[in-house]
């Protein structure tokens, strides 16, 4: 069965000697069933709407059903309310066996917009139809025929003929769909979720800058998965080792921004150990080698490096890394158990991140611009996606 679901607006059933949207869609598609949704303001039209529907052709007698709930005039201009109301209505009547038509051109702008969005987001098999005005322009200044005699309006209706001019437009809303995908991609970029962004961009039709945005984000995604250095960082005037350290630190920042606290805990200690190893090797040649030999260790932990720093009276550096050492018990809990993190552990992470940034900045003299790499990348990507 073909079913038309339609709100009733001021231009229904007729306006300026022509069909309103509701009647025109029924004239074109001849639905066997018409479900009408009235507001308090339009409820008085029920008899005229039914009469107009039956005037389309002598042999056309659709089943007309009025939705039980009448929409308050106080709500018809509130988009959120209309979105929820019409979502519920569509779900109430929808069946997979029937072919549904949705009128996108009757009622208030908020109702029309709600129906338009519902059609795009619900993912159900509904044919959404718009109707252009007879003039194919705005009909804002054309009066309504609400107070005229319905029989006379039917008699003078210029669309009431076999070879009427079809003004229906089946809506596939491709531009809207693309705009929605683009907005979703922007939202993911702002959350530093580049993998999700790339998945969305791969669904977009081509537009200026899309290729370059995809390439930049794909590079970031690949580098994050392999712990490699993004091309944008490679272009900075930094030594290879500095690029790796900065990239490792920024990856930890990204994980924290995205709420991946557990991953941040694990990575902070690893990067700190690398920095301390680099610091000691550059200043105390052979110290680490001899310590490994004495202790018969291949891998040195943050505690080993701390002991070595104490032997060299590096008390300022020891004070700097103290919050990271204190954090280690929480880090071990994350790495070796499935227990959730408590509030104190999350607080420790914030302190440890500040400590790590201080350590990285002091040892390698990175600028604030270096630390803002992903924020600056996001600004560039968002500008290209405008």
Task: Mark where each language-model region is.
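Long, low-complexity, Lys/Arg-enriched
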Residues: 1-99, 110-386
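Terminal helix-to-tail segments of small alpha-helical proteins
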Residues: 106-108
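Conformationally flexible catalytic loops at phosphate/diphosphate-handling active centers
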Residues: 102
